[in-house]
């Protein structure tokens, strides 16, 4: 049988197929890094596609290695890493308090539009954490929707961190990294741990507790 995918039906078919390929996934711990937060060619690494410990997410996305231990604290050429950051086209993005509120406003819009269920959310200096229930859409599409509405909110409120780099045609570079991290959650204990982690995370960033209207209890 040949299936021809057209427009939104194509997205829907791919999303349903993706969900079926991970039948045990009930929730996701989604991490959205900002532009410049981490470089994919960082000389450090770890043992899997996702950083095994959430605490190590702050050290960035890992490159694959055969090591059975974390290499996040391994000695590496710090100057090389900093030079790579300096070579970025735009300055690394860090959100201030007003920008974090604008981002949350955008997230709220996406949650309402998509009918997503979010159990926890932290908007930090250079990334956002969310615990999201499984949905007919893929986590990649949900992430794209969240980032899009957050960016629109920043732009509308004239708080876009890269507005000084607006092009002649009015385009502003995205404040988000192209990639995301998503940790699959398939049991209630893991869910509760993820929620606690995200709820406590603002304090680790030196931020006040965050309470968002689009977050619902699990």
Protein language model regions, located:
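Short catalytic/metal-binding and nucleic-acid-binding patches
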Residues: 1-218
């Amino acid at each position: 049988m040949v299936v021809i995918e057209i427009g939104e039906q194509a997205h829907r078919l791919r999303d349903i197929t993706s969900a079926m390929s991970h039948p045990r996934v009930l929730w996701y711990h989604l991490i959205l890094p900002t532009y410049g937060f981490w470089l994919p060619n960082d000389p450090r690494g770890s043992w899997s596609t996702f950083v095994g410990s959430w605490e190590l997410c702050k050290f960035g996305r890992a490159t694959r290695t055969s090591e059975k231990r974390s290499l996040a604290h391994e000695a590496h050429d710090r100057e090389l890493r900093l030079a790579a950051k300096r070579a970025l086209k735009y300055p690394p993005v860090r959100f201030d308090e007003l920008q974090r509120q604008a981002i949350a406003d955008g997230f709220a819009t996406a949650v309402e539009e998509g009918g997503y269920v979010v159990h926890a959310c932290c908007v930090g200096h250079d990334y956002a954490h969310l615990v999201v229930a499984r949905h007919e859409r893929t986590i990649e599409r949900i992430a794209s929707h969240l980032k899009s509405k957050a960016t629109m909110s920043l732009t509308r409120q004239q708080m876009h961190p890269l507005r000084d780099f607006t092009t002649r045609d009015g385009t502003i570079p995205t404040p988000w990294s192209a990639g995301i991290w998503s940790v699959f959650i398939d049991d209630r204990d893991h869910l509760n741990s993820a929620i606690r982690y995200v709820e406590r995370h603002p304090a680790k960033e030196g931020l006040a507790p965050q309470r968002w209207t689009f977050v619902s209890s699990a």
